[in-house]
Amino acid sequence: MNEYQTFDFASLRYSHLKNGFWGHRTENYMEIINSQLEALLCPTNSARLLNFGIHAGEVDDKFYGEYWSDGDCYKFLEACIYVYQNTGDLAVKAVVDKYIPWIVASQQEDGYLNTQITLTGKERWSKVIHHELYNIGHFLTFASAHYDITGETVMLECARKLANYTYGVFKDYPRELAH
């Protein structure tokens, strides 16, 4: 974009899938949500909400999953928020609300948020393969959607804390490294 172009954010709050190709694929949303939730709560699934529950003290286990596990959980919760926005079904919002305290408990005091690092003792930012920025990006989009659709600020505050932490880590790096 140049100085003469502008970009206005189009809130998904004004978008609804009612019929047609995608509209008809949303009719069984609770069945799909429950199926995905069951997978994310499976102790041996590569993406696990349970990792957040460990931080919250509600799950007695150790980290299990892939480097991108947190990101997959955020994408699921973001999808649920969009379904809630489209349907108004409080059962969908309750799914998201149940795991928000787990995410809050997983965030470190300095704002860092990544269970595969904090639960395993790995050094932060030591290997690009750890997908830390990938997971952060997915969290920020989930938190933004959550705030935009619900007006609730708990995830937005976590996102702000995480963004400030991330900025502090990378602010002194050369701009050429950004891509």
Predicted regions and their residues:
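Glycan-recognition and catalytic cores of secretory/periplasmic carbohydrate-active enzymes
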Residues: M1-H179
